[in-house]
Amino acid sequence: MCGLRFIMGPVRLEILLFILAAYGAWAEATKEEEDDTERLPSKCEVCKLLSMELQEALSRTGRSREVLELGQVLDTGKRKRHVPYSLSETRLEEALENLCERILDYNVHAERKGSLRYAKGQSQTMATLKGLVQKGVKVDLGIPLELWDEPSVEVTFLKKQCETMLEEFEDVVGDWYFHHQEQPLQHFLCERHVLPASETACLREAWTGKEKISDGQEEADDEEEEEEEEITKTSGNPKHDPEDL
């Protein structure tokens, strides 16, 4: 019996070590996946979206030929200054108004990676789940159906951090607007003033459009059906984390 124990001991130890190694690898993979699906936006992502929104707002008024009259006519005979609207402080103030509020128009697209997960429009996952509801499938997200389209925790955090960053770097934005518009705002603000060089990776992430199916709606429908089947296989009452939608 002692001999048997002597033989089995190393075998059991080997099995135990194998189980521990397998569990460690699984836990690490799970952690990496959760890091990208359950996280708050980084400072890089906040700055990226802030600069994108501001440049987009300014681009809508950049071609205006309106001329503003500034100042008052005084007894000294000084005349009002005429300033092109496209170069005026008024234009910047109007672009900044409700800038961070517009961040709430973004949604979390959990099927995308990195900063690309934050985009306007409905995510593929949410579209699929709403399609299931329309077909009569009961989907449990832990929140009422009427709240599905409300801003998520991540997007709300984005908006708050946008306000904080804008307040902190207001002078930098003004300096760029009046003196450095030949440079992209994202480079001038994010790379030169807000972020250390080691934290700028998200600025280089760009949506290529290759992930979309431009023609061939059948292929898109097939993918949606496969996802629906995967969801309904779990049970008649599939559950999802609303933060991943």
From Swiss-Prot:
Biased composition annotated in UniProt, kind: Acidic residues: 216-230
Tissue distribution: Highly expressed in lung, spleen, thymus, and uterus. Moderately expressed in kidney, stomach and placenta. Weakly expressed in brain, heart, liver, small intestine, skeletal muscle and testis.
Coiled coil: 209-237
Annotated compartments: Secreted
Biological processes annotated in GO: positive regulation of protein localization to plasma membrane; regulation of protein localization
Region (Disordered): 207-245
Disulfide cysteine pairs (residue numbers): 44-202, 47-190, 100-162
One cellular-component annotation, GO: extracellular region
A Gene Ontology molecular function term of the record: signaling receptor binding
Signal peptide from the UniProt entry: 1-27
Keywords: Coiled coil, Disulfide bond, Secreted, Signal
Family, per entry: Belongs to the canopy family.
Role, per record: Plays a role in the regulation of the cell surface expression of TLR4.
Subunit structure: Interacts with TLR4.
Name used for this protein in its record: Protein canopy homolog 4
Organism: Mus musculus
